[in-house]
Amino acid sequence: MRSPVQLQHGSDATNGFHTLQPHDQTDGPIKRVCLTRGMHVPEHVAMHHTHDVGPDQCCSSVVQMIHAPPESVWALVRRFDNPKVYKNFIRQCRIVQGDGLHVGDLREVMVVSGLPAVSSTERLEILDEERHVISFSVVGGDHRLKNYRSVTTLHASDDEGTVVVESYIVDVPPGNTEEETLSFVDTIVRCNLQSLARSTNRQ
């Protein structure tokens, strides 16, 4: 079984960066930094990808390098009101509470056919314009991804581009394994971030 990962303290955590290592499974919730094994990220980025993972949940993350400054990428990522700008699996989106710019606002998303879902009601959890962090959770809808929560961060790369990190936590659906759940969600997230890279470069 693929194990979640936790922040590894000690000699590997130096110069403001953290190296992430696997953590043994436990029976209760545990705070885990859900990033790819061996990934080096700034400490202020890693802290945003910490989730309370229960025994029937899984978490993972996907990283995308984009050859554009963070401000250009953020202009698309921040659009809680219009995720279709780079998420191709979304057929329609409408704000049902608020204006899409404040924590607590809700959106209703309709997905394209062919996916094991019809709709999703999502709540904006974080919108940090200064640090380039956005997070949403799924609070309703017709789908199988119960208790899904996503966090996306942007930080500058050494070559004046952008590193996008998106992590998530979700319940493992009944009848599915952790590996199957991670494979499915990772694929969706990866496709979205690849589309984000293409959309940013077209600006």
Swiss-Prot record:
<feature type="binding site">
    <location>
        <position position="87"/>
    </location>
    <ligand>
        <name>abscisate</name>
    </ligand>
</feature>
<keyword id="KW-1003">Cell membrane</keyword>
<comment type="similarity">
    <text>Belongs to the PYR/PYL/RCAR abscisic acid intracellular receptor family.</text>
</comment>
<comment type="function">
    <text>Receptor for abscisic acid (ABA) required for ABA-mediated responses such as stomatal closure and germination inhibition. Inhibits the activity of group-A protein phosphatases type 2C (PP2Cs) in an ABA-independent manner but more efficiently when activated by ABA. Confers enhanced sensitivity to ABA. Can be activated by both (-)-ABA and (+)-ABA.</text>
</comment>
<dbReference type="GO" id="GO:0038023">
    <property type="term" value="F:signaling receptor activity"/>
</dbReference>
<dbReference type="GO" id="GO:0005634">
    <property type="term" value="C:nucleus"/>
</dbReference>
<dbReference type="GO" id="GO:0010427">
    <property type="term" value="F:abscisic acid binding"/>
</dbReference>
<feature type="short sequence motif" description="Latch loop">
    <location>
        <begin position="143"/>
        <end position="145"/>
    </location>
</feature>
<keyword id="KW-0650">Protein phosphatase inhibitor</keyword>
<keyword id="KW-0472">Membrane</keyword>
<dbReference type="GO" id="GO:0004864">
    <property type="term" value="F:protein phosphatase inhibitor activity"/>
</dbReference>
<dbReference type="InterPro" id="IPR023393">
    <property type="entry name" value="START-like_dom_sf"/>
</dbReference>
<dbReference type="Pfam" id="PF10604">
    <property type="entry name" value="Polyketide_cyc2"/>
</dbReference>
<feature type="site" description="Involved in interactions with PP2Cs">
    <location>
        <position position="177"/>
    </location>
</feature>
<feature type="short sequence motif" description="Gate loop">
    <location>
        <begin position="113"/>
        <end position="117"/>
    </location>
</feature>
<feature type="binding site">
    <location>
        <position position="166"/>
    </location>
    <ligand>
        <name>abscisate</name>
    </ligand>
</feature>
<keyword id="KW-0938">Abscisic acid signaling pathway</keyword>
<dbReference type="GO" id="GO:0005886">
    <property type="term" value="C:plasma membrane"/>
</dbReference>
<feature type="binding site">
    <location>
        <begin position="144"/>
        <end position="150"/>
    </location>
    <ligand>
        <name>abscisate</name>
    </ligand>
</feature>
<dbReference type="GO" id="GO:0005737">
    <property type="term" value="C:cytoplasm"/>
</dbReference>
<feature type="region of interest" description="START-like">
    <location>
        <begin position="51"/>
        <end position="201"/>
    </location>
</feature>
<dbReference type="GO" id="GO:0009738">
    <property type="term" value="P:abscisic acid-activated signaling pathway"/>
</dbReference>
<protein>
    <recommendedName>
        <fullName>Abscisic acid receptor PYL5</fullName>
    </recommendedName>
</protein>
<dbReference type="InterPro" id="IPR050279">
    <property type="entry name" value="Plant_def-hormone_signal"/>
</dbReference>
<keyword id="KW-0675">Receptor</keyword>
<feature type="region of interest" description="Disordered">
    <location>
        <begin position="1"/>
        <end position="29"/>
    </location>
</feature>
<keyword id="KW-0963">Cytoplasm</keyword>
<feature type="compositionally biased region" description="Polar residues">
    <location>
        <begin position="1"/>
        <end position="18"/>
    </location>
</feature>
<feature type="site" description="Involved in ABA binding">
    <location>
        <position position="185"/>
    </location>
</feature>
<feature type="binding site">
    <location>
        <begin position="117"/>
        <end position="122"/>
    </location>
    <ligand>
        <name>abscisate</name>
    </ligand>
</feature>
<feature type="site" description="Involved in interactions with PP2Cs">
    <location>
        <position position="116"/>
    </location>
</feature>
<keyword id="KW-0539">Nucleus</keyword>
<comment type="subunit">
    <text>Monomer. Homodimer. Binds ABA on one subunit only. Binds to CARs protein in an ABA-independent manner, both at the plasma membrane and in the nucleus. Binds both (-)-ABA and (+)-ABA. Interacts with HAB1, ABI1 and ABI2, and possibly with other PP2Cs.</text>
</comment>
<dbReference type="InterPro" id="IPR019587">
    <property type="entry name" value="Polyketide_cyclase/dehydratase"/>
</dbReference>
